[in-house]
Amino acid sequence: MEKQIQRIYLAGPFFNETEIKNTEYAEKVLEKRGFTFFSPMRHKVDAKPGTMEWSDQIFAMDKDEIHNADAVVALYYGGYSDSGTAWECGYAAAIGKPVILVHADRESNANVMLISGSTTNIYLEDLETYDFETLPAYGYQGKMF
């Protein structure tokens, strides 16, 4: 029997208003659906931002949280691929974690490494109904590069 999804790592950039809004939306949906989740946007470290110590602490925390998660839900903005999010998706896939790639819009080009390396491809609004128990695999139907 496969392990039930209970704890989710919510990957995605949060560098502008749209990304923050979408992250907040995903957090609300996951909370409403009863999942425990780790959202890097909500977690800080003690080191001074911009220092190597800060970088090392963020990296260690996020890597540990990916290990602790049952799955990764990644907010993806197509051609604009946040390097941190891409790393988190690749790392999660490499250690056998399901990766649910959540496309923030239907117009952007998508990177083949992210769409093919993910368990499934859904859109932001699909988070409300996606079946995390059976993890159906949906192929990406949009433009890709």
Kindly label every feature range from the protein language model.
Residues 1-145:
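Conserved catalytic or regulatory cores that recognize and/or transform ribose-phosphate-containing ligands
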